[in-house]
């Protein structure tokens, strides 16, 4: 299971390398969608069925609409792929070489260390009350996001709206 998670993580980073090498918008959108699916599978691997499904439906659904619209507005007759130009190919190869170097370094030094500790999340923890029952952590986490992070949700929604508006204005040419 650890190797599957490791391969999924490598696939996620390689997807980001493929996107950051600035291919045509069609290929960039495809790579982001595939990376999003891999990220959702990683969440499912950690036992977050509810959160993985929500991320898949909301994030990927919105992304497919936005990228479908922008690629329709900015369609190219000959789209630039990763092997089309020397610059794009070199950037992909450098990114993949850095990922292979990181994988070998982690393998050599026997893992990674924990950098972030979550010490002050006591109010988000689930405590068992009287009686017996099954409580899943995923919906409780979504409830905590909307309860404690309500302003973060508002700012995120506004940012997504402004981002879509900017992309539409740029694609339209005004």
Curated annotation (Swiss-Prot):
Cite a single Pfam family from the UniProt record: Oxidored_q3
- Which GO MF terms does the UniProt record name? NADH dehydrogenase (ubiquinone) activity
Ordered alphabetically, the record's keywords are: Disease variant, Dystonia, Electron transport, Leber hereditary optic neuropathy, Leigh syndrome, MELAS syndrome, Membrane, Mitochondrion, Mitochondrion inner membrane, NAD, Primary mitochondrial disease, Respiratory chain, Translocase, Transmembrane, Transmembrane helix, Transport, Ubiquinone
> Which cellular component terms (GO) are annotated to the entry?
mitochondrial inner membrane; mitochondrion; respiratory chain complex I
Q: Name one GO biological process term.
A: mitochondrial electron transport, NADH to ubiquinone
Principal subcellular localisation of the protein: mitochondrion
Q: Which domain of life is it from?
A: Eukaryota
Could you tell me the membrane topology recorded for this protein?
Answer: Multi-pass membrane protein
Described by its record, this protein's role is as follows: Core subunit of the mitochondrial membrane respiratory chain NADH dehydrogenase (Complex I) which catalyzes electron transfer from NADH through the respiratory chain, using ubiquinone as an electron acceptor. Essential for the catalytic activity and assembly of complex I.
- Give the disease entry from the UniProt record: Leber hereditary optic neuropathy: A maternally inherited form of Leber hereditary optic neuropathy, a mitochondrial disease resulting in bilateral painless loss of central vision due to selective degeneration of the retinal ganglion cells and their axons. The disorder shows incomplete penetrance and male predominance. Cardiac conduction defects and neurological defects have also been described in some LHON patients. LHON results from primary mitochondrial DNA mutations affecting the respiratory chain complexes. Leber hereditary optic neuropathy with dystonia: A form of Leber hereditary optic neuropathy, a mitochondrial disease resulting in bilateral painless loss of central vision due to selective degeneration of the retinal ganglion cells and their axons. The disorder shows incomplete penetrance and male predominance. LDYT is characterized by the association of optic atrophy and central vision loss with dystonia.
Q: Subunit structure of this entry?
A: Core subunit of respiratory chain NADH dehydrogenase (Complex I) which is composed of 45 different subunits.
Q: Which family does it belong to?
A: Belongs to the complex I subunit 6 family.
Q: Which PANTHER family match?
A: NADH UBIQUINONE OXIDOREDUCTASE SUBUNIT ND6 (PTHR11435), NADH-UBIQUINONE OXIDOREDUCTASE CHAIN 6 (PTHR11435:SF1)
Name of the molecule in the record = NADH-ubiquinone oxidoreductase chain 6
């Amino acid at each position: 299971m650890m190797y599957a998670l490791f391969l999924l993580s490598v696939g996620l980073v390689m997807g980001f390398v493929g996107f950051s090498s600035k291919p045509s918008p069609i290929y960039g959108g495809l790579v982001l969608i595939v990376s999003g699916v891999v990220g959702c599978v990683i969440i499912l691997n950690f036992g977050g069925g509810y959160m993985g499904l929500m991320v898949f439906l909301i994030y990927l659904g919105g992304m497919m609409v936005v990228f479908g619209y922008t690629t329709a507005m900015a369609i190219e007759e000959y789209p630039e792929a990763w092997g089309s130009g020397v610059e794009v190919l070199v950037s992909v190869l450098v990114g993949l070489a850095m990922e292979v170097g990181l994988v070998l370094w982690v393998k050599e030094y026997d893992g990674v260390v924990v950098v972030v500790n979550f010490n002050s999340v006591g109010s988000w923890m689930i405590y068992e009350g009287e009686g017996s029952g099954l409580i899943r952590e995923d919906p409780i986490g979504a409830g905590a996001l909307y309860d404690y992070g309500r302003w973060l949700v508002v700012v995120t929604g506004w940012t997504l709206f402004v981002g879509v508006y900017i992309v539409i204005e740029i694609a339209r040419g005004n």
